Amino acid sequence: MIRSVLLRALAARPPSAPVPGHLHRCLLGTHRRKIKPEQLELPNQTREFVYSLSPETRSRLLKELQTFESKTEDSGEASRLTAAQLRYILLHNAIPFIGFGFLDNAIMIAAGTQIELSIGLTLGISTMAAAALGNLVSDLAGLGLAGYVEALAVRLGMQIPDLSPRQVDMWQTRVSSHMGKAIGVAIGCILGMFPLLFLSDEEDKKPKKDSN
C-alpha cells in the first residue's frame, strides 16, 4: 500500500522541481524530520514527504521502488524465514531502541531530580509534578537526539536484513520487528535507570527523632 502511494507520488512529481519554501523551514536542523511508515499511507502525507526530498534522493527512491516491485512480480512463492533471519531482524530493530530507551529514562530521571531539588523546593511542587517536568525535558531532548542515535546504530555496521520482497511482507517479519523494538526499549529503559545509583535517599539525611 505504502509503496504504491509512493510510486504514484514520485511519478507525479517532476524530477527537477524545486522544494517548497515551507518544507525547507520544516527540515531546518541537523537531521531531517523523521517520517514514520504509517504516516505515508495517506496521499497528502506521502506527497509532502516526496516534495521534501532532493532531486537525487527522489530519483534513487523511485529506482529502488521500481526494482523492488519488479522483484516482487518476478519472485514466486516466498521461502520460509529461518530462525537465524528472524533473530537478525529482531536484533537489527532492537539496537536503536536500546539507545532511545536509555536516553529517555536517564534524562527524565536526572532532569526530574534536579527540578525537584531546585524549582520544586522554591515553588513547592510535588514529586510527581517534578517527574512530569523531567519527562518533558526528556521528550524535548529526544527530538534532537533521535537522529544521532540512528546514525550511531548505522555506524555499528549492522546491515539491513537480506530478505526477498515477499519475505518483507510476511507476518513473521513484522512480529520479529515489533518484538525487537519492544525488547530494545525495555533494555534501554532499565539501563537508563543508572542515575538512581548516584542519588542518595533524602530520608537517610534527615536526623532520626528519638522516640519518647
From Swiss-Prot:
Disruption phenotype: Morpholino knockdown of the protein causes pericardial edema and altered cardiac morphology in 4 days post-fertilization (dpf) embryos and severity increases as embryos age. Morrphants are not viable by 7 dpf. Hearts showed abnormal cardiac looping in the morphants and a significant decline in heart beat rates seen in after 4.5 dpf and continue decreasing at 5 and 6 dpf. Ventricles show a significant reduction in amplitude of Ca(2+) transients in morphants between 4 and 6 dpf.
Segments traversing the membrane: 89-109, 117-137, 140-160, 179-199
GO biological process: cardiac conduction; cardiac ventricle development; heart development; regulation of cardiac conduction
A Pfam cross-reference name: TMEM65
Disulfide bonds: none
Cell compartment(s), UniProt: Cell membrane; Mitochondrion inner membrane
Residue numbers on the Cytoplasmic membrane side: 1-88, 138-139, 200-212
Record's signal peptide: none
Entry keywords, A to Z: Cell membrane, Membrane, Mitochondrion, Mitochondrion inner membrane, Transmembrane, Transmembrane helix
Entry GO terms, CC: mitochondrial inner membrane; mitochondrion; plasma membrane
Function: Essential for maintaining proper cardiac intercalated disk (ICD) structure and function. May regulate cardiac conduction and the function of the gap junction protein GJA1. May contribute to the stability and proper localization of GJA1 to cardiac intercalated disk thereby regulating gap junction communication. Regulates mitochondrial respiration and mitochondrial DNA copy number maintenance.
The protein, known as: Transmembrane protein 65
